[in-house]
């Protein structure tokens, strides 16, 4: 009986831990309004990608295969900057 409880507990903890890892992958491409990736010219450390990633609520970013990559970018923040731009454009349309 104790073995079953231990197995169930381990399975539940493993499932919860696995879900949390899926929510924050190590590196993810941030996306523009049209779901395209941000282009960059210099692979490796790249100030432009650093700025893009900071605007997407992450601390670290670099250029990989000529696209910006952000470390630990959550699913909610993949299009974070695009959502802000959309909101601003909607407000401008209302004003004008």
From Swiss-Prot:
GO molecular function, a single term: sodium channel inhibitor activity
Ranges of residues in domain LCN-type CS-alpha/beta: 26-89
Entry's localization field: Secreted
Protein name (record): Neurotoxin 23
Keyword annotations from UniProtKB, A to Z: Disulfide bond, Neurotoxin, Secreted, Signal, Toxin
GO cellular component annotations of the record: extracellular region
Tissue: Expressed by the venom gland.
Cysteines joined through disulfide linkages: 40-63, 49-68, 53-70
Leader sequence segment: 1-22
Domain comment, as recorded: Has the structural arrangement of an alpha-helix connected to antiparallel beta-sheets by disulfide bonds (CS-alpha/beta).
Family according to the record: Belongs to the long (3 C-C) scorpion toxin superfamily.
Matches recorded under Pfam families: Toxin_3
InterPro entries, sorted: LCN-type_CS_alpha_beta_dom, Scorpion_toxin-like_sf, Scorpion_toxinL/defensin
Originating species: Lychas mucronatus
Domain of life: Eukaryota
């Amino acid at each position: 009986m104790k073995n079953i409880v231990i197995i169930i507990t381990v399975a539940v903890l493993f499932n919860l831990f696995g879900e949390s890892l899926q929510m924050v992958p190590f590196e993810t491409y941030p996306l523009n309004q049209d779901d395209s990736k941000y282009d960059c010219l210099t692979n490796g450390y790249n100030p432009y990608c650093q700025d893009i990633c900071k605007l997407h609520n992450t601390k670290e970013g670099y250029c990989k295969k000529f696209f910006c990559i952000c470390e630990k970018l959550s699913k909610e923040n993949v299009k974070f900057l695009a959502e802000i731009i959309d909101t601003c454009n909607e407000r401008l349309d209302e004003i004008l």
